Amino acid sequence: MQLIEVSAKTGYVWFRQGIWLFRRNPLAFVTLFFTYLLAMMLVSLVPVIGAALPLLLIPGIAVGFMAACRDTIAGKQVLPTILIDGFRSYGPIVTQRLLTLGGLYIVSMAAVFACSALGDGGTLLKIMFGLGAENLGPDALESPGFKIAALIAAALYAPVAMMFWFAPVLTAWHDVPPVKALFFSVVSCWRNKGAFTVYGLLWFALALGVSFGLAALMQALGASAYALMVMMPASIVITAMLYCSFYATYRGCFGVQEPGAPKLPNTSDR
């Protein structure tokens, strides 16, 4: 495993590579995303622990998305079952480590939203973990305290995202123990913070541009009432492309995970 340091403009390359990868097999990636959403919804219905189960499974599912990207580049068929690739293809030790990462992710997210309670007294925490959120009125979501809590959560989530950005795939594909994987992930994200900043701004600009563009178009057509109906599939496509770009960031920061693995195109010159 080699940790690669890249320039800020590489963030644009990752952005383009994510879109290119999605275009290789758009139907498969949209299907994967829908399958993921459905699975997480069903898992969350489990009594008592349902709110935490999706977080527990996220690291393993992340490996599945990465495997789907790898197989798409290799020209292999991608089926929804690849989402559980992390739990079935690398042995019981890797499965245990991925679940350990999931447990650490639960603790990290609980800490983030617990701190957000300083802003709104725990409203956001209740919503995210299903702790009596059904009793909250609409006024609670519109209060200044709730907005402050959201800002606190967003700020604290940044280091959590850095820890878990590469940790699952490092654990599954490089046999790195969970704690070391979290450390290497943070180091890689920090060393390439310029590229990640450009990368994040580009995705934010795309999402914002599509949202405003579709809203303006629907208003011009006199169909504003249907704007949300049009925006939902657009949001799904953008999110699926974003997920594809995660693989590009991994390859950009750590190179090829195995001998003979297919290469991503360098889209910087296109």
UniProtKB/Swiss-Prot annotation:
Traits of the deletion mutant: Disruption confers resistance to cellular contact-dependent growth inhibition (CDI) CdiA-2 of B.pseudomallei strain 1026b, but not to endogenous CdiA. Unchanged binding to B.pseudomallei strain 1026b inhibitor cells.
GO cellular component: plasma membrane
Keyword terms of this UniProt record: Cell inner membrane, Cell membrane, Membrane, Transmembrane, Transmembrane helix
Main location: membrane
Membrane disposition: Multi-pass membrane protein
Disulfide bonds: none
InterPro entries recorded: BPSS1780-like
Keyword Cell division: no
Cellular location(s): Cell inner membrane
NCBIfam families registered for this protein in UniProt: BPSS1780_fam (NF041043)
Record's protein name: Probable inner membrane protein BTH_II0599
Organism: Burkholderia thailandensis (strain ATCC 700388 / DSM 13276 / CCUG 48851 / CIP 106301 / E264)
Taxonomic lineage: Bacteria, Pseudomonadati, Pseudomonadota, Betaproteobacteria, Burkholderiales
